[in-house]
Amino acid sequence: MAENITMNVGEVLTTIIVKDSGGITVGAMRVNLFDVRLVSRLQEIAEFLRGFRPAGNGIERMMAMDVALEDKFCYLLGYDCRAELFGVLSPTSILPDGEMYTIRILQTIEENFADKIKERAEARAAVLDKYLQRYKK
């Protein structure tokens, strides 16, 4: 019989809660802000947004774009986030300040990603210094 070993990796996922100006939760997402591959997936979505021109007119075009963006966000976050993130607001919803919901989500992830990576790098440097001090003695 095989032995099972459990390894605890600490907190990996960050939950970002989306609220309206009245404080009502309208969406949420779980993202691993420590995943360095997140950057390449963010870049892929940015390229997709620049070049994507769905067929059709008016509402058909917006619906096609919504479906495509939902798929891209599932890929970005690594799970099916449709109900959680887009249950109230669709990806192409225009916010009161004129910005598209998709853009706001991407900006929030990007801003928080840089901070988390910096935190993790500082923590890693402290651990390495601690171990190096042992060998200097």
Regions found by a protein language model. Name each.
Residues 1-59:
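Short N-terminal mixed-charge amphipathic segments
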Residues 58-69, 114-116:
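Contiguous, amphipathic alpha-helical segments that mediate oligomerization or scaffolding
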Residues 81-137:
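C-terminal charged interaction modules
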